[in-house]
Regions:
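Acidic, PIN/NYN-like endoribonuclease modules and their adjacent C-terminal/linker elements
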Residues: 1-12, 16, 21-24, 37, ...
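Acidic, metal-binding active-site segment of PIN/NYN-like and related structure-specific nucleases
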Residues: 50, 54-67
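Conserved BB-loop
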Residues: 28-40
């Protein structure tokens, strides 16, 4: 049985080159700035991502943590939220790819994960 791959939506503050780099590696990744929704509030962003079955990768922990709590309490489904501290582009790419290789869409669904869980062991 094959595992469904994660589809990602990168929030507008994430390095835009990440979408291109991951797409070139065969992953389904889009950047918010390429969707016509730049500047969208967080709730509509999550609604948009959920409707497309896309997990959101964001640096915006301040707004997304309480938003996800509200969605959890309301039993609203989403494809997952990945929170991250700001990282250099190479590190961001490595950790994002490690996440995409490690988890399936089903494992990420309705969860919140830290991208830093997927950093290389030192």
């Amino acid at each position: 049985m094959s595992r469904a791959a994660i589809k990602l939506l990168l929030d507008e503050h994430i390095w835009q080159g990440l979408a291109e780099a991951l797409t070139q590696r065969g992953y389904d990744v889009i950047h918010l700035n390429d969707t016509g929704h730049r500047g969208i509030d967080d709730e509509p962003l999550l609604v948009f991502a959920a409707a497309q079955g896309r997990a959101v990768l964001t640096y915006n922990t301040r707004h997304f943590v309480p938003l996800i709590r509200l969605w959890y309490e309301a039993n609203r489904e989403h494809a997952g939220v990945i929170l991250s501290v700001q990282l250099p582009s190479g590190e961001l790419l490595n950790q994002a790819e490690r996440l995409l290789v490690t988890l399936s869409a089903d494992e990420l669904k309705n969860t919140v994960r830290w991208l830093q869980e997927f950093q290389a062991d030192t």
